[in-house]
UniProtKB/Swiss-Prot annotation:
Xref: Pfam families: HMG_box, Sox_N
Function in brief: Transcription factor that plays a central role in developing and mature glia. Specifically activates expression of myelin genes, during oligodendrocyte (OL) maturation, thereby playing a central role in oligodendrocyte maturation and CNS myelination.
Region span, Disordered: 1-60, 154-191, 205-268, 350-369, 433-461
One Gene Ontology term from the biological process aspect of the record: morphogenesis of an epithelium
Originating organism: Gallus gallus (Chicken)
Protein name: Transcription factor SOX-10
Length: 461
């Protein structure tokens, strides 16, 4: 009875044998255990012998002090509190896994592998498998027939033994994980791109509709895809244009070839409100260089009332839209003294409002871009060279001196562009049509117009 009790303790306790091994891990312990094993059953003998071998191997690895410390820590531990692992698929020992019946190749490979492994014990298993596959492909039907018949016999026997068997392949976890990671990565990239586009769109919308009284939000919706005002964008437009502007144009339902750039009203925008991303995308310019030409904390002169663009014919060159666009209001080919002559240019300017983040080469067919010249006040000869193809039938320039309301003084230039300041309705003058005082220079899309501007100070008459 004492021997059986000792054996049960050795089986149940994971450290039961370590107390004996701590002090004497020599052959004496093996002789003691052999006396116990002689009186035990065959099943218990194999199990205890395995535990004995494992414990002896562990004893050889660690010194006596380490084994004593481990035994002291684990002596009072209750192993019944350790949770048993639960299989996810629900299979347990009462329901063992049923293997698939072997096909003809597996019958051949199993028999040939055993024979070749006995003949060539040094042969690697992978090389053996490749050789078996090559040999199977070289066999003819007569050679394969015995293996096919054996596989059919095994299949029928398997069907009798397991009538309810249904093949359920195990899903590969790594393939599923990689697929999920790929989907998550795609979603992450799409979400990042969408967030960037949404950020730029919000920035454009904030500039485009700063208030209900702004010229563009006063009862005039954005252009639909069918409305195309103004000249189309030439094919030489640089590729440095903001991609967010392209996305906005597509979302608004109008192609890029019609408008070219999203509408932004700078009439009520302070320089502090311009997002840093838009400013930093102008690669050709130095952002810090702009600040010395801008007024400190100004707000643009706000036009009092815009009833409609038919009534908005009163918009002169100093109106908010014409000044924000910086061009189309000068392109009128009509000769007239009344302000109604500027109706179509102002409507054109609505379609051709430039973004501040647009590239310096984003010019149109009628004249080159004025991105950098727009930040300074220029005398009339330089103005004539910068806008070569403009006929000026509506403006009065006495003695090459710009009129006061057209180039307002720097103290009044509180908008974003000091050269083309935004004027209220009370500041809009009537321009008489005279001949062009400055010789017209042939139009050129070369970058010389914005790389070397001439900065001059204008005096108000």
């Amino acid at each position: 009875m004492a021997d059986d009790q000792d054996l049960s303790e050795v089986e149940m306790s994971p450290v039961g044998s370590e107390d004996h091994h701590c002090l004497s891990p020599g052959p004496s312990m093996a002789s003691d255990n052999s006396s116990h094993l002689a009186s035990s059953g065959n099943g218990e003998m194999g199990k205890v012998k395995k535990e004995q071998q494992d414990s002896e191997a562990d004893d050889d690895k660690f010194p006596v002090c380490i084994r004593e410390a481990v035994s002291q820590v684990l002596s009072g531990y209750d192993w019944t509190l350790v949770p048993m692992p639960v299989r996810v698929n629900g299979s347990n020992k009462s329901k063992p896994h049923v293997k698939r019946p072997m096909n003809a190749f597996m019958v051949w490979a199993q028999a040939a592998r055993r024979k070749l492994a006995d003949q060539y014990p040094h042969l690697h298993n992978a090389e053996l498998s490749k050789t078996l596959g090559k040999l199977w492909r070289l066999l003819n039907e007569s050679d394969k027939r015995p293996f096919i018949e054996e596989a059919e016999r095994l299949r029928m026997q398997h069907k009798k033994d397991h009538p309810d068997y249904k093949y359920q392949p195990r899903r590969r976890k790594n393939g599923k994980a990689t697929q999920g990671e790929g989907e998550g990565q795609v979603e992450g990239e799409a979400g990042g791109a969408a967030s960037i586009q949404a950020h730029y769109k919000n920035a454009h919308l904030d500039h485009r509709h700063p208030g209900e009284g702004s010229p563009m939000s006063d009862g005039h919706p954005e252009h639909s895809s069918g409305q195309s005002h103004g000249p189309p964008t030439p094919p030489t437009t640089p590729k440095t244009e903001l991609q967010a502007g392209k996305a906005d144009s597509k979302r608004e339902g109008r192609s890029l070839g019609e408008g070219g750039k999203p509408h932004i009203d700078f009439g009520n925008v302070d320089i502090g409100e311009i997002s840093h991303e838009v400013m930093s995308n102008m690669e050709t310019f130095d952002v810090n260089e702009f600040d010395q030409y801008l007024p400190p904390n100004g707000h643009a002169g706000h036009p009092g009332h815009v009833g409609g663009y038919a009534a908005a014919a009163g918009y002169g060159l100093g109106s908010a839209l014409a000044a924000a666009s910086g061009h189309s209001a000068w392109i009128s080919k009509q000769h007239g003294v009344s302000l109604s002559a500027t109706t179509s240019p102002v409507v054109d300017s609505k379609a051709q409002v430039k973004t501040e983040g647009s590239a310096p080469g984003g010019h149109y067919t009628d004249q080159p871009s004025t991105s950098q010249i727009a930040y300074t006040s220029l005398s009339l000869p330089h103005y004539g060279s910068a806008f070569p193809s403009i006929s000026r039938p509506q403006f009065d320039y006495p003695d090459h001196q710009p009129s006061g309301p057209y180039y307002s003084h720097s103290s009044q230039a509180s908008g974003l562009y000091s050269a083309f300041s935004y004027m209220g309705p009370s500041q809009r003058p009537l321009y008489t049509a005279i001949s062009d005082p400055a010789p017209s220079v042939p139009q050129s899309h070369s970058p010389t117009h914005w790389e070397q501007p001439v900065y001059t100070t204008l005096s108000r008459p």
